[in-house]
Curated annotation (Swiss-Prot):
Subcellular location(s) per record: Cell membrane
Transmembrane segments: 28-48, 66-86, 94-114, 126-146, 154-174, 182-202, 211-231, 243-263, 287-307, 320-340, 348-368, 378-398, 414-434, 480-500
Protein name: Uncharacterized MFS-type transporter Rv1877
Protein family per UniProt: Belongs to the major facilitator superfamily. TCR/Tet family.
Amino acid sequence: MAGPTAPTTAPTAIRAGGPLLSPVRRNIIFTALVFGVLVAATGQTIVVPALPTIVAELGSTVDQSWAVTSYLLGGTVVVVVAGKLGDLLGRNRVLLGSVVVFVVGSVLCGLSQTMTMLAISRALQGVGAGAISVTAYALAAEVVPLRDRGRYQGVLGAVFGVNTVTGPLLGGWLTDYLSWRWAFWINVPVSIAVLTVAATAVPALARPPKPVIDYLGILVIAVATTALIMATSWGGTTYAWGSATIVGLLIGAAVALGFFVWLEGRAAAAILPPRLFGSPVFAVCCVLSFVVGFAMLGALTFVPIYLGYVDGASATASGLRTLPMVIGLLIASTGTGVLVGRTGRYKIFPVAGMALMAVAFLLMSQMDEWTPPLLQSLYLVVLGAGIGLSMQVLVLIVQNTSSFEDLGVATSGVTFFRVVGASFGTATFGALFVNFLDRRLGSALTSGAVPVPAVPSPAVLHQLPQSMAAPIVRAYAESLTQVFLCAVSVTVVGFILALLLREVPLTDIHDDADDLGDGFGVPRAESPEDVLEIAVRRMLPNGVRLRDIATQPGCGLGVAELWALLRIYQYQRLFEAVRLTDIGRHLHVPYQVFEPVFDRLVQTGYAARDGDILTLTPSGHRQVDSLAVLIRQWLLDHLAVAPGLKRQPDHQFEAALQHVTDAVLVQRDWYEDLGDLSESRQLAATT
């Protein structure tokens, strides 16, 4: 056979993601996605140690919780829309738009002159952050081969966990040494770098069919949640509980929630189908997830306020002194996920977690201005461990007890309740704190003869003489510890519900117990295909092999020929043309090593060759179809152990299985089945 023509540049018109992107280009894209997720995740916690300074400069202690709450709400509401818009417009366009929105929100946050402007800017920033997070996961799934996807997405998930440590530290340092405004502006240069890579390196990817988006459901649940949080935050502080404003908000929220339930029962693509709550396991997990979010963000937000006003800690020191809680949370969360994945037992963990949270808040309610920092750190470790024991395992329980068709919405549902709980926790802690402080601050100011402007600033407060500062410090200490005492009742309710949690056998379809993104991140809308791919990617390392296929009756091809056949099929699906020189270039192997194998395909009628260009013949396409049937059957045999699949209607599962089978054929690199290069040469030389 004539040798190939002169090498051509590798094709760039990619129709679908896969392993044929060069490793360098793929890693550049993935690094940009990691940094995108990093700035989105950091935005959630970086503001926490800066809050006392922000309140001192902008005023309005009543509205301080909105600096955290509005970000969470904005990110949660946009998740479903961003995922569906990615299907409709293309992931890269949505990523570019999301980063722009995030940058605009970050700039406006840094320019804010009032707490109201900051809250609105934070909501805009949260919208961008939520869209970045969900789009980054989707893009990683498209540019990374199926077999490597778990490892890459695990890195994205770990970013959320790492950020829980680094966010408060960075926010504290920037506040002390630059300005609290830099806690927002620091995102801009990183985001511009992400924009540059996304605009230049991400290929044009295939779009799935036009999705169905539950716009009305998203709008209604956003209105209901926002109204409830506003009522919680303003009740008893800005407005009396019996005022027309608060009553109107509560009535409006109740009407919106009722309409949402009615609407979701009839929606074609419901974001939270009411049928999910027919499962006692799902219903209890949602409530427990709410409690976990309530405790985690409530504590993360108000512990630094305690440390600043009561202990006189700087913003940097406050960030450092929250580390015991975060470390306890991370260790307990990852360890619990691994243990549940190995043992299949889960009930003990949320029970123990809720108990530890109740004990921790009770201990924290006994703190005062003389409590040693070491003892405070111990209490925070207990609190973090309690949150960690509960948080990750709740996602895992829902993923392993839901039916196949509901896995995506069930996972995003339980995560949604955690985020809503975090919003309510921050708002409730803030409202209680303002109420308790107002009762004490007047007498404290009188007894200490302190000028009012000195009160909002922790730094100024602790520079006052002891006789003047002590009554104010005591007022803050008693108010915050009373808030912690109120939190005990919420965790006790969670403990009782955890005791009622029914333990059922776990399925095998989703055991990504160490994916911190599920526990720490925003909700992610997963389709049935996404869920099935999660199961398949775990089976691939020890899964179907070309050697197994070659031994099947009627195959008629050896391992090397099967590999060559699939390479032509992959390149035809992914590129405009199949060139032998391009195959060698992508594999970093001289094309002459594999040329005899492709020539044998031509001789047997499975392929045709015109110089450097290869194509499959009708016989070759039929052979690929036969391989797809064998792979599909292998997947069915191994997925049959998952009870959730047995309850799934055939048509949806069949469609998802076909999608995943095709992804295996197109995205899997079968090169490892040939062994090392010397074995490949021997196979290529064999007739």
